[in-house]
């Protein structure tokens, strides 16, 4: 996908905010803990290759990604610190990971056996992290016998270096800690079965550190908080108060490319879902669902100059229209998303409008949008 650098529309990423969020996370670690910055999904839409060096400078000890290709992107960006892939990869790719010093997760004995054949053929050793499903219902070992079999298989097996063992919490951002406590108990039980001792045991995620969940963890996998967003922000939920302030890093700006007056009874957009009840001023913004600004944003208010104006008519593939209170000139700035968390068009408010979470909104902004990095 071509990035539209010649279009008046861009995501602005505040590097000073990224640095400060990283430093704050680092400062709140317990003695001996390491900070692994989660930059999967293009750093939650913010730009992984550009931000990883900034996080590294601010104190990151390593990085987490979702897939091997994301890890390879970081290596191409000259990142030399540890990289852990969190999602399962084909065993056939184990040699590629090993050759690039990228660690992979393991969830089955069958995968280990397949990977060993690949590694033996290439004469490589792979760093692995044993994934435990302690209650997420996703990847990882959950049955004692399966885990014991893997433990036995790894005894003296030099095709693998057991670098880590980890789990992921389903509800660390919840005020009700009962399921969180259950997962901790389950993980500790699985840990007790392991005689091949990993270098790192890690369970803490963004929510665990922000909300002071007291769990022994060698690594904190810090994700959404890096970008200044509170993980306790599901639609209609009560936000938990984080242990330190977060500074949102993303804003989304464009401008009016066209302004016209329409008369009473005139329709706007596909299906004419907006019909002018009187003579109205309509402005066009060059952003659409092909950029991740989806059709459900119809009715959401964006800031045109100093005024919040509703989106009228259906969002088109490449453009959307807003109802203006009066005639304003083409070229007037339009702020689709504000970095101010209290603004009506913050990422959180946008997520509320879409009945989703701000993770999803940020991640859906794709590579057609230019990303401009400010405050270096």
From Swiss-Prot:
State the family named in the UniProt similarity comment for this chain.
Belongs to the alanine racemase family.
Q: Which Gene3D superfamilies match?
A: Alanine racemase, Lyase, Ornithine Decarboxylase, Chain A, domain 1
Q: Which residues form the active site?
A: 40, 270
Please state what class of enzyme this protein is.
isomerase
Residues binding substrate are 138, 317
Q: Answer yes or no on keyword Secreted.
A: no
**Which pathway does the UniProt entry assign to this protein?**
Amino-acid biosynthesis; D-alanine biosynthesis; D-alanine from L-alanine: step 1/1
This protein's name? Alanine racemase
Q: Which reaction does it catalyse?
A: L-alanine = D-alanine
SUPFAM superfamilies on file: Alanine racemase C-terminal domain-like, PLP-binding barrel
